[in-house]
Amino acid sequence: MAISSAICNSFKQEILVGTHNFTASSGNTFKIALFTSSASLGAGTTAYSTSNEISNTSGSAYSAGGATLTSTTPALSGSTAVCDFADVSYTSASFTANGCLIYNDTNGDRAVCAIAFGSDKTVTSGTFTIQFPTADASNAIIRIA
């Protein structure tokens, strides 16, 4: 099992039929769920599942299903459409995560993208932050060129 960073194939088709709305004030609710190294996430992932989702080693910083993302309305960076989210922090956290899945909580928990952290990331009684990259044509977490 492994996590590989990819825009999910199902998402590519679903945006063409209007399944996903990233508009900040009136769009769908998107969430980010964290997973262990035993998870299998990547381009073929179609929906969120609790299988191999992380659990707290102590405390209650992380809840099943993950955190709700705050999005900015999609924009153009040159000729590339980009979408961005506010960084997510889990405070007083104790857990280990190897990657995550962004998914549409409004529309059937459909997968948007999987992100591999490159290795296990562990936090013990601290703050675990997911920092999203700059929302431009080269770096945005979701880009359509």
Question: What annotation goes with each model-predicted range?
Answer:
Residues 1-98, 105-145:
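Small cysteine-rich, disulfide-bonded extracellular modules of the LU/uPAR three-finger superfamily
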